[in-house]
A protein has these predicted regions:
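Tryptophan (W) side chains
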Residues: 14-17
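Non-catalytic alpha-helical scaffolds and adjoining flexible linkers that form interface surfaces
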Residues: 23-269
Length: 269
């Protein structure tokens, strides 16, 4: 009797193990919204694309490069910051997912046709690809990015400071938004703690008063008020570098952004 009981227990455990394995490996059909961050040609006929999705956060996909105009998924869909609705079989253990279908949900009216907006879009897409590298599902963050992209495309003027407002406000969703409450003229900014201080901290990651004042200005910029901030080319580029440095301290292995050079060239040094 004991042997029969033991055998039944083993069979029961085996059954649950098989069921759980089936659950883990069986793909689940998913439809979600997504934003294109970057794409890279892989081999002769494949494309690897990094997307920020509403349902799963960051996801990497592989797809075949379409050879004809009749192809279901067109290469043009994978330009930086394109807003999509995608359908795919989600395999939790797979490094690369495979798209079933993709369609554009918001055709751009100005970003691809404006040199200045395109430079900003390329910069923001590269920035996001590093800032959200390990991001899981975060619907609030996704909605913020989507709304911001739509705003940039629809803006008629006064959008040169868009990326500055976007970078600083994104940090709120990532958990290290700076604290403006303690700012007073002449104080320093502690990059590690993200707050303004009256005395030099016990490390070298801080901003002198002039740069600290610029950081305070960055935190006041919104899409509605950015036209009030008349930065010179030099000041805007300096503020961009300050924001990048802030992210590099809070996100491991955050690199210098190659597209920053393009942004500098478009807006001047």
């Amino acid at each position: 009797i004991f042997r029969i009981f033991a055998t039944m227990q083993v069979l029961r455990l085996w059954f649950f193990w098989v069921c759980s394995l089936h659950f883990i490996t069986t793909p689940m059909l998913v439809k979600t919204h997504a934003i294109v961050l970057r794409s890279l040609k892989y081999g002769d006929n494949q494309l690897i694309t990094d997307l920020l999705t509403e349902a799963f956060g960051r996801v990497s996909f592989v797809s075949s490069i379409p050879r004809t105009q009749k192809a279901k998924i067109k290469k043009q869909l994978f330009q930086p910051l394109t807003l999509l609705e995608i359908e795919f079989d989600h395999r939790p253990t797979a490094r690369l997912q495979r798209l079933r279908d993709a369609r554009m949900t918001y055709p751009f009216t100005s970003i691809p046709y404006s040199e200045a907006k395109l430079a900003i879009a390329l910069f923001v897409a590269e920035f996001l690809s590093h800032a959200t590298r390990d991001e899981q599902q975060n619907v609030s963050l996704y909605k913020y990015v989507e709304t911001s992209v739509r705003w940039l495309d629809g803006a008629q003027h006064a959008f040169a400071n868009f990326h500055l407002a976007f970078m600083i406000r994104l940090s709120r969703f990532l958990g290290f938004y700076p604290n403006l409450n303690d700012y007073t003229r002449g104080c320093l900014f502690d990059l590690r703690s993200g707050c303004f201080v009256a005395s030099i901290p016990m490390h070298n990651d801080y901003l002198q008063p002039d740069d600290a004042a610029q950081m305070a200005n960055l935190m006041r910029i919104t899409p509605q008020t950015m036209h009030l901030f008349g930065f010179s080319h030099h000041e805007r580029n300096r503020c961009t570098q300050l924001a990048i440095n802030f992210y590099r301290l809070h996100i491991p292995n955050f690199p210098e952004l190659k597209s920053f050079d393009v942004l500098r060239a478009v807006y001047g040094e």
